[in-house]
Amino acid sequence: MIPVSHFHPLSVHFPIALITVAFLFDVVSLLCKKEPCLSTAGYYLQILGMLGAIAAWGTGHFLAGTTQMEGEAMQVKGQHELFATLSLIAIIVATVARIIMVYQKTENTFYKYIPFGLSLLSVLFITVTGYLGGKLVIDFMIGL
């Protein structure tokens, strides 16, 4: 049986990849306007990434309650939790805004840059979150 402490590491990698690739598809879509399929693919990847991020955040929140830390490890854990929450909020707001725009058929207006900016912000937050999570594992051997 898989230990409970492994659920978070198992669940974080897919949303990271999905959200990052969705953002990259959107960047290329902005540069190559003749390829609407890139934006559509980015849209669906972003939705899947958001759902995965919710699961990853939930498993991390659960794991945080089962792991005892102190000192610098506790500080890094707090920063990791903060950036994970900021990542989740940014990707949820970006995805909901994008879904609304698709259903209102306003995704080809200037307003498309709002979810795009939030997606960029979420990718930046995810990068910091991943760095801090790696620091917890490598420097403090948390989760091993």
Each predicted region: which residue ranges?
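Polytopic transmembrane helical bundles with strong interfacial aromatic enrichment
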Residues: 1-144
